[in-house]
Amino acid sequence: MAQSTALTICGLVYSPAIGQELVRLHTSDIDELVYFSSEREFCNYLEARRNSIACLILEWGEGTPQIITYLHHSATLLPAILIFPAAPAPPPAGPHYHIAEVILTTDQLDQLNRQIEEAITGFVKLCPGCAVPPHVLFRLPALKESSNVDPQHRLSQKLKERLGYLGVYYKRDTAFFFRRMSPADKRKLLDELRSIYRTIVLEYFNTDAKVNERIDEFVSKAFFADISVSQVLEIHVELMDTFSKQLKLEGRSEDILLDYRLTLIDVIAHLCEMYRRSIPREV
């Protein structure tokens, strides 16, 4: 039997009791565990290792809403467990981070190990293969069926793969909208979007590339900044112009660039879907 790949569980916990419980779990079924009481250290770790994390554990505190905002705006969507105080009031209604999050109270810490698997399973069923390290799919028996999903690069298949994932975004903070940013912040965001979109185009027809993750990252940033479809189109046209000039210098045909209309349609389709789902149902 092949050796299983380690899971990485990353926690932000403030109370020693929860930290001790995580340490206890680390000696049982979880192969790798890191947790922090400092929000800054937690965010720094995520910046460096977000693609290797299988599940987040967040103890609810005064700074947790800001941490969740950070996760959303950095396009970091992962399986998650939120831990609330057991008394006196019940946990506030969610979702807080996304609709597949698992809620526990401090008197349910004995369930934490099992709920980690529940959080991963629920998130992968929400969106097969999205934002979860591939080895996690094979680590948990409940996910074996989901692990057989073959990521296709046809528009119709990719729409099917990510429909559930798109539904996790249900609120936006207008303070972060593009039109309210400073000129410097606008330039920074557009540079980020151009860089991500260029990677999407270059990897789009590469079956080994994680293009879905790139599209999710691009669309998430655009959605939370209220970027218009026309701005996305402008980014696409600018990039195609750059490629066209390079092809001309190399004496090659520009016809290949027509294939990337599918890339543009794919990205715009998902951005429009996110905008559609952000409209309250009663409207």
UniProtKB/Swiss-Prot annotation:
Transmembrane stretches, start-end: none
An annotated Gene Ontology molecular function: identical protein binding
InterPro entries: CheY-like_superfamily (IPR011006), Circadian_clock_KaiA (IPR011648), Circadian_clock_KaiA_N (IPR020844), Circadian_clock_protein_KaiA_C (IPR020856), KaiA/RbsU_helical_domain_sf (IPR017944)
KaiA N-terminal domain ranges (all copies): 3-163
Alphabetically ordered keywords of this record: Biological rhythms
Chain intervals for the UniProt region annotation (Flexible linker): 164-172
Keyword Ribonucleoprotein: no
SMART domains (alphabetical): KaiA
Single Gene Ontology BP annotation: circadian rhythm
Protein origin, superkingdom: Bacteria
Result when mutating residue 266 to A: Weakens KaiABC formation
Keyword Protein biosynthesis (UniProt): no
Residue span, KaiA C-terminal domain: 173-281
Effect of residue 163 to A: Weakens KaiABC formation
Region annotated PsR domain, not required to form KaiA:KaiB:KaiC complex, or for a full KaiC phosphorylation cycle, chain positions: 1-146
Subunit structure: Homodimer. The KaiABC complex composition changes during the circadian cycle to control KaiC phosphorylation. Complexes KaiC(6), KaiA(2-4):KaiC(6), KaiB(6):KaiC(6) and KaiC(6):KaiB(6):KaiA(12) are among the most important forms, many form cooperatively. Binds to KaiB and KaiC, the N-terminus (pseudoreceiver domain PsR) is not required for either interaction. 1 KaiB binds to one subunit of the KaiA homodimer. KaiA and CikA bind to the same region of the KaiB(fs) form and therefore compete.
Similarity remark: Belongs to the KaiA family.
Function noted in UniProt: Key component of the KaiABC oscillator complex, which constitutes the main circadian regulator in cyanobacteria. Complex composition changes during the circadian cycle to control KaiC phosphorylation. KaiA stimulates KaiC autophosphorylation, while KaiB sequesters KaiA, leading to KaiC autodephosphorylation. KaiA binding to the KaiC CII domain during the subjective day yields KaiA(2-4):KaiC(6) complexes which stimulate KaiC autophosphorylation. Binds oxidized quinones via the N-terminal PsR domain, allowing it to sense redox changes and possibly mediate clock input.
Written domain comment of the UniProt record: The KaiA C-terminal domain mediates homodimerization and formation of a stable complex with KaiB and KaiC. The N-terminal pseudoreceiver domain (PsR, residues 1-146 in these experiments) is not necessary for most KaiA functions, while the linker region (residues 147-179) between the 2 domains is probably required at least for KaiA:KaiB interaction. Undergoes large conformational changes in the KaiABC complex which inactivates the second KaiA monomer, preventing it from activating the KaiC CII domain. The PsR domain binds oxidized quinones.
Protein name (Swiss-Prot/TrEMBL): Circadian clock oscillator protein KaiA
Organism: Thermosynechococcus vestitus (strain NIES-2133 / IAM M-273 / BP-1)
